[in-house]
């Protein structure tokens, strides 16, 4: 997809754009259905010839289909105009007034061979005189100053007859979100010169290898599950890119990316893809692949002609896109193709899925990295960069390895279910012929591609992907840090809690010992008082027994007195008094010893 520049001018609240028609390429295109394409071209020529004069009709009949073959996208500050084979981009410092845009008239000047579009702009205000993302005309100043500087550049360009001078001056390119652009092709009308009749824009764009193919696809060979564009000839390359970007944004999974961000989730028994070392200098071709290569080379009906620099750039970008998908599959399968290899090599390549055209290496890398973190099993940004490094090594000196892998991919597409033969027909076979031709793709040219790709890799970062990867990683890091704080807090509190539990156990053990000691002392005291009680009871019983004996003795004394024996009674009384006093003295001594023992026990208990 070629890029062109637009000359513009502001007049009050309107912006006039001058878009040159792209030159006719010398390279002929292949038509999937030549009869249908010829009929469409002849009908367009007849319609144009009815309105224009005979001389003008003869001059423009062959190119009227190319004049009408346009696709237009517009936003508040941006306009994308795809004319036949070339994309023109314009960023306005003024805001376009799209509220009442129902029909946009496009004038084509057959003499000067350019399109002219006039768009209304919103009035300038004090606070909104510059468009977002920078000013194409001035850079950094106020809106009036930027307008004066832009007018000065336009005056110089008009004086020197260089309408693209203002666009070629160094300015900061604004960041445009292409998926937000609105397609207004159906609202546009084309007017040739000053004729009153207007025409609708048509859609008949090229696709495939170097955009050489046109017409409808053979749907029987199309894998609808992988290929998202079934009518590439009806969609311009910018529309195909927009479809791809929107699909990737819908299918991108934040959680899946988080899972593979810190460490790849490699199944057990498989090698980590980041540790794989491809052997690009050790390759061999099977007999079946050699036979396939021979047949593909014989299918070439005409010699490879040197194409212009724009087509060459598109071919090289397509080759790099195919190679990146192959490198990912080889690295993730350890160069042992699986049943999913055909799907992997097709889903990671926008050429197969959307028939997309690339004109610079940066877009190729960004598209591959976006799809790599969206669709396959391993979705890791660093893994994608490693695949790019593998592709660089292949371009440096792995031509045989590349041819072998292209043939293997051809076999996988042909034998897959559903069939992916359309990818072989429109891309792979032409690229196999291109790589195997030393005149079309020399070793020096491949080394130049490797150097350019290496330089671009250093400039591409995660912000270029446009999927919020940096924000997702920051969010994940915060979550991991929060979990680490929680784990550290739980681990820090558990030893303290364990130490506290040990102290509590020690206290419980000490209190238990104290309880046991107290219980022993209490038992000693209780036993002492129990023994004292028993002794007192014994003393009382002895006293009772003595009283009974005294009563009996009194009775006997009475009998003796009756007999007149008084001396013996006195002697017995003295003996009883002596025995009772001795008994009382011994009992008191025993009681005192028990009390002393109790007091000693209490003293010992209080001391402990």
Swiss-Prot record:
Q: What ranges does the record list as Acidic residues composition bias?
A: 502-524, 543-579
Q: Where is this region: Disordered?
A: 487-531, 543-608
GO cellular component assignments: cytoplasm; nucleoplasm
Q: Where is the composition biased (Low complexity)?
A: 489-498
* Matches recorded under InterPro entries: Shq1, Shq1_C
Which terms does the UniProt entry file under GO BP?
box H/ACA snoRNP assembly; protein-RNA complex assembly
**Where are the bilayer-spanning segments?**
none
Q: Where is the composition biased (Polar residues)?
A: 588-608
Q: Which GO terms describe its molecular function?
A: unfolded protein binding
Give a Pfam family name.
SHQ1
Record family assignment: Belongs to the SHQ1 family.
* Function of the protein: Required for the quantitative accumulation of H/ACA ribonucleoproteins (RNPs).
Q: What name has this protein been given in UniProt?
A: Protein SHQ1 homolog
């Amino acid at each position: 997809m070629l890029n062109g520049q637009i000359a513009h001018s502001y007049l009050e609240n309107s912006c006039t754009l001058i878009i040159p028609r792209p030159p006719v390429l010398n390279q002929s295109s292949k038509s999937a259905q030549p009869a249908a394409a010829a009929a469409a071209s002849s009908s367009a020529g007849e319609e144009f010839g009815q309105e224009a004069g005979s001389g003008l009709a003869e001059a423009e009949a062959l190119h009227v289909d190319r004049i009408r073959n346009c696709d237009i996208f517009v936003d508040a500050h941006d306009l994308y105009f795809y004319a036949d084979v070339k994309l023109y981009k314009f960023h306005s410092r003024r805001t376009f007034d799209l509220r009442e845009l129902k029909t946009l008239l496009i004038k084509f000047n057959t003499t000067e061979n350019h399109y002219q579009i006039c768009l209304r702009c919103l009035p300038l205000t004090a606070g909104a005189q510059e468009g977002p993302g920078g000013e194409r005309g001035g850079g950094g100043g106020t809106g009036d100053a930027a307008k004066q500087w832009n007018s000065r550049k336009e005056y110089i360009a008009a004086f020197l007859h260089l309408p693209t001078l203002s666009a070629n001056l160094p300015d900061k390119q604004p960041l445009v979100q292409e998926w937000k652009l609105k397609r207004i092709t159906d609202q546009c009308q084309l007017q040739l010169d000053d004729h009153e009749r207007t025409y609708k824009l048509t859609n008949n764009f090229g696709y495939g290898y170097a955009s050489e193919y046109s017409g409808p696809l053979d749907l029987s060979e199309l894998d609808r599950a992988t290929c998202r564009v079934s009518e590439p000839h009806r969609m311009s390359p910018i529309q195909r890119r927009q479809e791809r970007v929107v699909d990737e944004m819908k299918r991108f999974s934040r959680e899946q990316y988080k899972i593979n961000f810190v460490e790849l989730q490699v199944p057990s028994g498989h090698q980590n893809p980041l540790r794989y070392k491809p052997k690009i200098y050790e390759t061999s071709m099977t007999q079946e692949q050699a036979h396939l290569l021979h047949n593909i080379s014989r299918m070439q009906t005409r010699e490879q002609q040197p194409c212009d620099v724009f087509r060459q750039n598109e071919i090289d970008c397509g080759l790099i896109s195919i190679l990146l998908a192959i490198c990912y599959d080889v690295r993730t399968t350890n160069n042992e193709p699986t049943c999913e290899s055909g799907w992997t090599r097709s889903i990671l390549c926008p050429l197969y899925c959307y028939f997309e055209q690339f004109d610079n290496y940066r877009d190729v890398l960004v598209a591959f990295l976006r799809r790599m973190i969206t669709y396959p099993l391993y979705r890791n940004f660093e893994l994608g960069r490693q695949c790019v490094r593998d592709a660089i090594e292949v371009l440096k000196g792995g031509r045989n390895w590349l041819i072998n892998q292209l043939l293997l991919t051809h076999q996988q597409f042909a034998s897959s279910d559903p069939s992916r033969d359309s990818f072989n027909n429109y891309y792979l076979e032409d690229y196999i012929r291109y790589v195997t031709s030393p005149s079309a793709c020399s070793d020096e040219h491949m080394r130049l591609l490797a150097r350019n790709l290496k330089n671009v890799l250093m400039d591409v970062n995660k912000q270029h992907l446009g999927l919020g990867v940096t924000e997702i990683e920051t969010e994940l890091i915060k979550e991991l840090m929060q979990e680490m704080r929680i784990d550290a807090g739980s681990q820090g509190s558990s030893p303290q809690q364990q130490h506290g539990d040990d102290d509590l156990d020690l206290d419980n053990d000490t209190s238990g010992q104290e309880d046991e000691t107290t219980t022993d002392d209490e038992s000693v005291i209780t036993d002492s008082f129990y023994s004292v009680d028993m002794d007192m009871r014994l003393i009382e019983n002895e006293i009772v027994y003595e009283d009974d004996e005294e009563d009996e003795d009194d009775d006997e004394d009475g009998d003796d007195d009756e007999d007149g024996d008084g001396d013996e009674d006195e002697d017995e009384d003295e003996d009883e008094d002596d025995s009772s006093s001795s008994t009382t003295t011994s009992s008191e001594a025993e009681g005192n010893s028990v009390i002393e023992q109790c007091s000693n026990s209490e003293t010992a208990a209080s001391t402990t």
